[in-house]
A protein has these predicted regions:
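An alpha-helical interface "stripe"
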Residues: 1-179
Length: 179
């Protein structure tokens, strides 16, 4: 029985943030005293997950003492919320999800080279965070077409926001696969 759940309902950035928020709140009920995050508190979380590079995201994902945390100021108290616990990998409170056909919207910035919406093939998420991005091609195309597509998406700024946490890219044409 697979631990991975296919989430056909997650297609937009808003969907992904709402899903991440739900998982974060579920995994931190004790720290939140049963009270969900307010919108302003969740904005604090989102701001901490705007990584300037995949490397910076990787540094954060190492965590401290096996726990990856975000911090939220609530009234006079600072809450330390667990995003991932390395002890719970492959079990425990970890949530594993698969999405496909995610719609990465074009930029509103007039000066951007990002001129159109894009659809990502497959993404694997852990606790609501996109970790592995997969581009698939058919056998008539080289797996390198997937590589160039990812490179184009990076240049267009598609891997920002919640997708700035991605740690691995996989390309495949069904014959050759690279990561």
């Amino acid at each position: 029985d697979s631990q991975w759940t296919y989430r056909e309902d997650l297609k937009t950035e808003e969907d992904l943030w709402a899903n991440f928020r739900y998982i974060l709140e579920q995994n931190n009920k004790d720290r939140l005293d049963g009270e969900g995050l307010s919108d302003s508190e969740f904005e604090q979380v989102k701001n901490q997950l705007q990584f300037s590079s995949f490397y910076k995201a990787g540094e954060w994902l190492v965590g401290e003492n096996g726990k990856v945390m975000v911090h939220v100021q609530r009234d006079m108290e600072k809450l330390h919320l667990v995003v991932m616990n390395h002890e719970h990998i492959a079990g425990g409170s970890s949530v594993y999800e698969v999405i496909n056909q995610y719609k990465a919207l074009k930029s509103d910035d007039e000066d951007s080279t990002d001129v159109r919406d894009r659809r990502f093939d497959v993404t694997l998420m852990i606790n609501g965070l996109p970790m592995i991005h997969i581009e698939l091609k058919n056998k008539q195309h080289s797996y390198m077409d997937g590589f160039w597509q990812i490179k184009k998406y990076i240049g267009e700024g598609k891997f920002t926001g919640i997708f700035s946490a991605v740690q691995m890219f996989v390309v495949s044409n069904g014959v050759d696969t690279r990561y």
